[in-house]
Amino acid sequence: MSRAPELDGAVAVQASYGDREASLAALAGVDTLLMISAAENEHRRTEHLTFVEAARYAGVKHIVYTSFVGAAPDSTFTLGRDHYATEQAIFESGMDFTILRDNFYADFMPQMAGEDHVLRGPAGDGLAALVTRSDVARVAATVLQDVAAHRSITYNLTGPMAITLAEVAAIISEAKDEHYSFHDETIPEAYESRKVWNAPSWQVDAWVSTYTAIANGDMREVSTDVETITGRPAESLAGFLSRDNPAPRN
């Protein structure tokens, strides 16, 4: 809503997930809530739990939450642990729920390459069933139109196939007509190469574990949930890139 306050019938309100009182005020009168996971930060778990509690106290009846494939207390992808804690808080809240567990986003793959067009990380030959954000949005929009039909269900949102990062690089190369490649770093190499960003340790752990989660096979499961819910097949990375980078007209 904050990005489109001009929509008919929409009222924009401001509240951060970690601000309980502001969230209570913002959620007053809300029956169905779409909770998009907060931006990555070291306090995200606390922010999420605060917001879920505020939703419960505000009287929200059904919460739809965008989580992560393989969310678990020991998730290889470190941020998946925050998603697990959030899911548990929702389950224990007494609110009706629908969980949308997203795979890694296909949209971000080109951005993961360096200026030299090399994707670097310890992913090996692991597979990822990358999903587009537009598919996740279509699923969420469909669910919100009839939440009762999706009550107490956890969906896995993926693309139509699982691919390696070497295949990702090849697909990007074809779409952009430029050469991209994948370099399979060791874990020590991955931590060393990311020192240049001078990022906090939790952030570097998240970056590196993006690749180790792929290497471990955590991201390989292909689900048909996107098509089942929306009636349209999930979009592939190649399809997304062709739409994002249309061929020039003669």
Regions found by a protein language model. Name each.
Residues 5-19:
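Rossmann-fold cofactor-recognition segment
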Residues 67-68, 233:
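Catalytic nucleophile serine of serine hydrolases
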Residues 188-250:
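A hydrophobic C-terminal alpha-helical subdomain
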Residues 11-12, 123, 161, 219, ...:
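Compositionally biased, intrinsically disordered low-complexity regions
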Residues 1-3, 18-30, 38-49, 53-62, ...:
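Oxidoreductase cofactor-interface core, primarily capturing Rossmann-like NAD(P)-dependent enzymes
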